[in-house]
Every structure is written in structure tokens, then in C-alpha cells.
């Protein structure tokens, strides 16, 4: 397997519960290295742009509202098969369907407030990383 990068968000619900450290511990325990990270409070414009592919869907307005409701942590993770591994750690989008021990099974409140976001493919990972980070903000750790 090749070393790859993925994009991740610790969403406002998890940040407000002080779960950043616990979530980062899960990433690192699974062999994923945090190579860029920052806390920010997304503006409506940032959230709308990030989730533009969902515009017009019934959940879009609620998603933008939720993602702007408080601070988030955005990060780039690097490791072997990082996209798949990160998605396994997160669990199913709906926490009721998430396997026991996954982040969403442990920390999500609902399908709408599901603690974390992760890229689903190499193309989306590249796009999402570039949305929040410039190349000089990414620090490979070897």
C-alpha cells in the first residue's frame, strides 16, 4: 500500500465536548500522522463552499448551520491507505449503523451531528486539503 493523505474535520459537536485529544489519539493509534492542523470557526461562506456538492439537498441548510455553530478542527492525516483507514476509524455516517468502537459509535449524537468528517476518495481528499491548507502549512513527518 502507498502512503496517502486524507482530510479530516472534528466537527463542532465533538469540539464542544472536548474530544479533540481522544479523536487524535485514535488517528495516531491507527498509524495515521497529523501533518497539518488548525482550529477555526467556519464562516457561512466557507461552509457553503466546502459543502457545495450538497447544495439543493434537503439537509444542506442544516449542515451549513451546524458546521458554523462553533469551532472545528481541520487536519491532514498521512499514512498507509489513509483514506480507507480513516473512514474505518470514523464508522458509518449514521451512528446507529456504526460499528462499536468507531468514532461515530462512541461520540456522535445523530446522523446530523456525527462528530467527524473524512474524505471519501483521493480526488476529494486533494480538493478538501487544498480548501483549508496551503502547501507550506503541511509538514510531512517521515
From Swiss-Prot:
For this UniProt entry, the molecular function terms from Gene Ontology, in alphabetical order, are: ATP binding; metal ion binding; nucleoside diphosphate kinase activity
Q: GO cellular-component terms in the record? A: cytoplasm
Keywords of the record, alphabetical order, are: ATP-binding, Cytoplasm, Kinase, Magnesium, Metal-binding, Nucleotide metabolism, Nucleotide-binding, Phosphoprotein, Transferase
- Stored HAMAP family: NDP_kinase (MF_00451)
In its keyword annotation, does this UniProt entry include ATP-binding? Answer: yes
Question: Could you tell me what reaction this enzyme catalyses?
Answer: a 2'-deoxyribonucleoside 5'-diphosphate + ATP = a 2'-deoxyribonucleoside 5'-triphosphate + ADP; a ribonucleoside 5'-diphosphate + ATP = a ribonucleoside 5'-triphosphate + ADP
Q: Which family does it belong to?
A: Belongs to the NDK family.
Q: What is this protein called?
A: Nucleoside diphosphate kinase
Q: Which gene encodes it?
A: ndk
Pfam name, any one: NDK
State whether it acts alone or in a complex, and with which partners, per the record. Homotetramer.
Amino acid at each position: 500500500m502507498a502512503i496517502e493523505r486524507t482530510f479530516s474535520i472534528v466537527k463542532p459537536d465533538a469540539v464542544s465536548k472536548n474530544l479533540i485529544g481522544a479523536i487524535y489519539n485514535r488517528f495516531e493509534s491507527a498509524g495515521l500522522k497529523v501533518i497539518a492542523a488548525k482550529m477555526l470557526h467556519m464562516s457561512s461562506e466557507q461552509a457553503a463552499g466546502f459543502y457545495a456538492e450538497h447544495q439543493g439537498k434537503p439537509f444542506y441548510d442544516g449542515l451549513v448551520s451546524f458546521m458554523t455553530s462553533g469551532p472545528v478542527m481541520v487536519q491532514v492525516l498521512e499514512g498507509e491507505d489513509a483514506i480507507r483507514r480513516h473512514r474505518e476509524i470514523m464508522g458509518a455516517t449514521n451512528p446507529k449503523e456504526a460499528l462499536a468502537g468507531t468514532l461515530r459509535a462512541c461520540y456522535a449524537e445523530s446522523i446530523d451531528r456525527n462528530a467527524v468528517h473524512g474524505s471519501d476518495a483521493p480526488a476529494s481528499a486533494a480538493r478538501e486539503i487544498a480548501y483549508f491548507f496551503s502547501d507550506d502549512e503541511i509538514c510531512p513527518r517521515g
